[in-house]
Amino acid sequence: MKKEIDLTEVRRICAEYQIEIKDLKSITGSFGKQIFLINQALLLRVSETPMTLEQDKFRRVATLDFVPKIIHTGVLQREAGPIYYTLLTLLPGDDFISVYRETTEAQQRQLGRDIAVFLDTLHEFSGTAYDIGLYVPALAHFSGTWREGHHEYWELLRQESEKAHLRSESIQVFERAYRFLQASSAVLEYQTGPKLLHNDFHPRNMLLHQGRFSGVIDWECSQYGEADFELCHLIHWCLYPPKPDIDLREFLRALFEASPTCAQVPDLAQRLTLYQIEHEIQQINWQGSEAESLRVPRLVRWMDGGVDELFANLDVDGRGG
């Protein structure tokens, strides 16, 4: 930002709505965005540019339980330029990863069941077109099929990866990955139509309060896609947890046992394998050589059956359906 909003300006915003500040904290959220926590009950998001798209994403899930609700939106005028803001309810609790060591296996399994119910409720919302891509759609409002969209997405990924200065052995892995995607694309033929996705659905965005599921945060990446795409990050985090002593298998096993609609898809393991390959390529394209040594071996593992290996461990039928 040209000039970050300071606490005095936060107080100006709160005064506009007769909010008395008793406790105020500043944190950095996703994508480096400045966030303020007010009275342990409200969350203030700010931006130099209009927040229309972000606010629309919160509004379209406003009828759901366990999500932040918009209270006020507006613009703060100042000499350094306007600041757009969104004031939301602050959900209670801490993210699953932060409190993982404090949870019992029974609580982890219950979280899996609760998340399955939450996803079924979320995926009842339908759209008219797919948004293809991870985090930020590479193809927004795509009018074709899910399979056609991914074929176009792979071509965009290939074009980007050709600009990267990859090692020769990495280029060989990338070529194998693109051949793998093309050869396996028939599994994407099955579709139920665009469903509303959180699209960054991993344990750091799930909250627990006193050991129980209390909400889902960070909806900035929300878009429309096939429901099984929502499982992409959960699979990734289970096989590659942020710390070696974090084991998400009990949680994920319970989620699959609850049989949410997003897991009742034919060829589920193969579809999730394609999504994982897309994810690794996308991250390397974005981060360059600094991600190459980490993610190229992961690419190989996915192609060599990483999802099948995980499903066997969880006793999940990878054929889905």
Describe the function of each predicted region.
Residues 2-17, 75, 108, 113, ...:
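An alpha-helical support segment within catalytic cores of ATP-dependent transferases
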Residues 18-25:
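Conserved N-terminal boundary motif of the eukaryotic protein kinase catalytic domain
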Residues 25-147:
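ATP-binding pocket architecture of kinase catalytic cores
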Residues 33-36, 44, 178-229:
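Active-site acidic catalytic loop and adjacent metal/ATP-binding pocket
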Residues 43-47, 71-72, 134, 196-199, ...:
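Short beta-strand segments
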Residues 229-263, 276-294:
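Active-site activation/catalytic loop segments of kinase-like enzymes and analogous catalytic loops
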Residues 268-275:
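Alpha-helical scaffolds flanking conserved acidic
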